[in-house]
């Protein structure tokens, strides 16, 4: 089983490791599933890749392979959220160096959205890539993408409870699950653990974790 090589959008799972989310295999994060749920709702063909799959793709296909893939795209979306200290036994979250390199390789003009706590942190540290039609989402990446697909305009948006429920359901059977490297081959039959989001924010941010991201 494999994904379509002619998919119109590329969804890159940079892994989301934050105080309330693991996001690194054998877990699949909720925000990346919501994002895929948006594309499912709009009936947009897309290809899902983890950052580890992307690294393997670059090594296997080289610059020509990367260029061919990028030039076939109509859009790009990435979630990056590694903001807590820790060591990883399997997957490694995307770095800002890798993110910059990927952005440079994107065709000029195609819509691209980057979201997640790492993106917000990098932006606060001064990262403001100058590229047409690239948007750094500071609120809900999924809702921001949904608004763009409806209006062709970038605007920071937050999802409604109804959207939250719908995209969670669509994302549960999206390519973020069906084509996750922990499930998609006989050599990797699972398990794959769904992370579930039941709450946003934290009431203990004033006297909580040292690596708190809420303030």
What kind of feature is each model-predicted range?
Residues 1-215:
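Acidic, low-complexity intrinsically disordered segments
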């Amino acid at each position: 089983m494999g994904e379509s090589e002619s998919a119109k959008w590329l969804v890159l799972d940079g892994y989301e490791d934050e105080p309330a989310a693991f996001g690194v295999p054998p877990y699949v994060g909720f925000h990346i599933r919501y994002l895929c749920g948006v594309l499912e709702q709009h009936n947009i063909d897309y290809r899902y890749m983890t950052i580890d799959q992307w690294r393997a793709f670059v090594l296997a296909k080289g610059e020509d392979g990367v260029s061919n893939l990028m030039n076939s795209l109509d859009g790009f979306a990435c979630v990056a959220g590694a903001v807590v200290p820790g060591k990883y036994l399997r997957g490694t979250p995307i770095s800002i160096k890798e993110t910059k390199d990927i952005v440079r390789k994107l065709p000029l003009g195609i819509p691209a959205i980057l979201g997640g706590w790492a993106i917000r942190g990098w932006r606060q540290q001064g990262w403001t890539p100058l590229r047409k039609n690239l948007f750094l989402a500071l609120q809900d990446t999924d809702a921001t993408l949904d608004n763009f697909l409806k209006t062709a305009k970038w605007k920071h948006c937050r999802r409604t409870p109804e959207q939250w429920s719908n995209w969670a359901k669509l994302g549960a059977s999206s390519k973020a699950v069906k084509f996750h490297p922990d499930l998609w081959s006989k050599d990797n039959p699972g398990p794959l653990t769904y992370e579930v989001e039941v709450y946003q924010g934290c009431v203990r941010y004033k006297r909580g974790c040292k690596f708190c991201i809420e303030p």
